[in-house]
A protein has these predicted regions:
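Serine-hydrolase catalytic core
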Residues: 38-39, 186-259, 275-295
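Active-site nucleophile loop of the alpha/beta-hydrolase fold
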Residues: 141-152
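Short beta-to-alpha linker loops that shape the active-site pocket of alpha/beta-hydrolase fold enzymes
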Residues: 76-83, 146, 259
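Short, surface-exposed "cap/lid" segments of acyl-processing enzymes
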Residues: 27-80
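Catalytic nucleophile-loop/oxyanion-hole region of alpha/beta-hydrolase
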Residues: 83-112
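N-terminal cap/lid segment of alpha/beta-hydrolase-fold proteins
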Residues: 2-40
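Gly/Ala-rich beta-loop-alpha elbow adjacent to hydrolase catalytic centers
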Residues: 119-128
Length: 297
């Protein structure tokens, strides 16, 4: 849902064109979320959802960051958010398509705020890290970013991804028991093997660039879930270590502890889990400002 009390076309042409990409086949809950004020352009944040999810995954964070004074953009990633929960659109998702979209989102955010933050979850976390490597944004917060699969060793992930691309695409259920009965309120109940492999190609490119150059973002906070079941925490720590060799003072790793075995810690469908993680994620994206204490001498 776009929140606005002015002409987006007049002030933010790129943003208006992005919103227009939400065609009739996109579900109401799958549409790009925009919460902006015409009178405030100090801070903007882009929130990037995970694979097969939709912008509604970040609805609560979008609301709270807007209340904190941010202009907020939660874009619908390419080929996501269709009204048909069994849409085959993801099988056509490509790595260059995702990267081009992120470039567009960052440029839009620069129209919305002088200081830009990008945060994202899972595949959105991967894209956030990719943006952190390339763009001089103020802050980047990759949340449980997809740099590999938890049960596949890093050295094997590349060959596995390329093998997936040499065979026909397959769709797999996120929940093999519920299958299509799994709630699709925030996205598709399936993922595509080709989409997964193309996302990993972005991760490989990111790691190659990170070994050679420091991240362009002024501050990066990588967020990992200590009880992660899907993405590879070792790979997250590896990127953290690589980046810190370049800029140890501006890269940090925040590990969430005390959660049950889990991956999706942001979706409103898992409201108890998301509720526990929410304050930590909010503070990672918008850190509390130090309080100045006045002393009477």
């Amino acid at each position: 849902m776009a929140v606005k009390d002015f002409s987006l076309a007049t002030l933010f042409g790129r943003l208006e064109r992005l919103i227009a990409r939400d065609h009739a086949g996109v579900a109401p809950a799958g549409r790009t979320i925009v919460r902006v004020r015409a009178t405030s352009r100090e801070r903007a944040v882009v929130l990037l959802h995970g694979m097969s999810a939709s912008p509604s995954q970040f609805e609560r964070l979008a609301h709270d960051l807007y209340e904190r004074g941010y202009n907020v953009l939660v874009p619908r990633l390419p080929r996501h958010g269709h009204a048909d929960p069994l849409s085959p659109a993801l099988e056509r998702l490509r790595s260059d398509e995702l990267c081009e979209a992120v470039v567009d989102y960052v440029e839009i955010a620069r129209e919305l705020g002088e200081r830009v933050t990008v945060a994202g979850f899972s595949m959105g976390g991967l894209l956030t890290a990719w943006a952190a490597q390339r763009f001089a944004i103020d802050r980047a917060v990759p949340i449980a970013p997809f740099f590999g699969i938890s049960w596949i060793p890093n050295r094997l992930m590349g060959p596995v991804a390329e093998r997936l691309l040499r065979v026909p695409n397959r769709f797999h259920w996120w929940n093999p028991i519920l299958r299509e009965r799994r709630s699709s309120a925030t996205g598709y109940p399936r993922y595509a093997t080709h989409a997964l492999a193309h996302a990993y190609r972005i991760a490989q490119e990111l790691f190659d660039e990170a070994r050679e150059n420091a991240p362009a973002a002024r501050h990066v906070t990588l967020v990992a879930n200590a009880m992660e079941v899907a993405v590879n925490n070792f790979a997250i720590r590896k990127l953290h270590d690589i980046w810190r060799r370049h800029v140890p003072e501006t890269v940090e790793l925040s590990v969430l502890t005390g959660l049950p075995l889990s991956h999706d810690i942001v979706s409103p469908l898992r409201w108890r889990l998301a509720g526990r993680a929410h304050p930590h994620l909010l503070d990672a994206i918008d850190p509390p400002q130090p309080v100045e204490t006045a002393y009477s001498l």
